[in-house]
Amino acid sequence: MSEKNIIIRLETKDDYRAVENLTRESFWNVYRPGCMEHYVLHCYRDDPAFVPELDFVMELDGELIGQVIYVRSEIDCDDGRKVPIMTFGPIGIAPAYKRQGYGKQLLDYSMEKAKEMGAGALAITGNIDFYGKSGFVPAKTKGVRYADDPEADYFLIRELTPGFLDGISGTYKDPEGYFVCEKNPEAFEQFEETFPKKEKLKLLGQLC
């Protein structure tokens, strides 16, 4: 995709380090002191659930300003079925370009590509004020419960195929790849040490 000075394209191996650094800058001290998202991204590239066809970067005038990855996931239905869907994230925008519409533009483009690949629905945890603008609704209104918090208003879902979730009642668990930092904290710390030092701060509004 190219619009004005913006290009959205697939990530290449040559982008890896720059994308990891962008992700680190985007999430640093946002949800917790420091961040983990850049390591999650780093590890997911070798995970079978990773969708390389939906691994996008965004450039503005040749400068890398955004990234998003997609991951295969599923709904565990109450009737025993497992319904394949997808999730995405991390999705990050460089701090200097946040709140200017680039994140939504990247998200909407990538969701259209996910739809073209046959994804029937996307499930995420996030802010309805942002994701609602791209068609997401609380998943519990569609019969899908978040395993960690069944009544969560922040667990969101969007049908990419109309009617895909009709008749479905079930539970969604975050894919295991999102827990690499907790499972191997030493490897995460070693990875973090390869980046420039940044101060970890405890700030109001963080989740942990």
Task: Name each model-derived stretch.
Residues F88, I93, R99-E112, I124:
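Conserved acetyl-CoA-binding loop-helix of GNAT-fold acetyltransferases
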Residues S73-F88, K98:
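A conserved beta-turn-beta hairpin within the catalytic core of GNAT-like acetyltransferases
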Residues I7-V19:
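A short beta-loop-alpha structural element at the N-terminal edge
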